Design a protein with these regions (language model features):
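Nucleotide-sugar donor-binding catalytic core of glycosyltransferases
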Residues: 1-234
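A short, conserved alpha-helix in the catalytic core of glycosyltransferases
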Residues: 237
Length: 237
């Protein structure tokens, strides 16, 4: 799910892709590891798109290239500094239809029977199909100069992020001759006891969210969990 963006790119560039556990170590589940077979050399590549700045030791030892979204320079282990590269933000996309989501998900589950979390494995394939949009939907359009749309998540441990997002919504609402639409996603109403956060009655489906975001005069981005580069930044770009 989190690495569908990279899988999409690989499937577009390489036609012969094989899913296998052979040649790989027991990595943290939040990664994408693959071996690129070139004419003169094989390259072992490990992609980390997690929120935090930490590193996976097994990934560092195994890989030739350790590509990471969220990096703090002073946390890079010196002995591996030459293989660590920043790759910027990413976001999940729909890469399989329902039929292929089921077929490929089950096929890869059978090939990887040592995995303990079968539900998470299957849900990753389902979620990219159910909740995300194909990359072709990410095309700019002419914005409406009288309209601002912004929808965001409330985070329990990121008060500054919530505060920044709330202030943007408040400022956008106060602008004359401009229509603001949006708010915080529902599901964490208990956080609103001491605040006045505008919480939506229902979530926007993803295609509608994209259309309204593209129509909006401006986009607003903040660091998210653990100060990470969130999906919104990648989508906005």
């Amino acid at each position: 799910y989190y690495y569908s963006y990279y899988l999409y790119g690989l499937t577009k560039k390489y036609k012969n892709i094989e899913f296998s556990k052979l040649g790989f170590r027991e990595f943290h589940h939040h990664c994408l590891a693959f071996i690129l077979h070139e004419k003169k050399k094989d390259y072992k590549i490990y992609i980390s798109a997690g929120d935090g700045p930490g590193f996976n030791q097994a990934g560092l030892e195994w890989s030739d290239i350790y590509a990471k979204v969220n990096i703090k320079k002073d946390t890079i282990p010196k002995e591996y500094s030459k293989k660590v590269i920043p790759i910027g933000p990413s976001f999940a996309v729909k890469i399989y239809n329902l039929n292929n989501s089921i077929k490929i998900g089950l096929r890869n589950l059978i090939r990887d029977l040592h995995t303990m979390n079968y539900r998470q494995h299957i849900s990753n394939y389902y979620r990219q199909y159910r909740y995300r949009s194909p990359i072709k939907f990410y095309k700019p359009q002419v914005e409406d100069i009288n309209y601002i749309f912004y929808c965001a998540t409330l985070w329990r441990k990121e008060e500054k992020t919530n505060y920044f997002r709330y202030n943007f919504m408040k400022a956008a609402k106060s602008l004359p001759n401009l229509h603001f639409e949006g708010g915080f996603a529902p599901g964490k109403e208990d956080m609103n006891h001491d605040n006045n956060y505008p919480i939506l009655e229902r979530k926007y489906d993803h295609e509608m969210y994209l259309e309204k975001t593209k129509k909006s005069l401006v986009a607003f981005n903040t660091p998210a969990v653990q100060g990470c580069l969130g999906w919104k930044l990648g989508e906005f770009l």
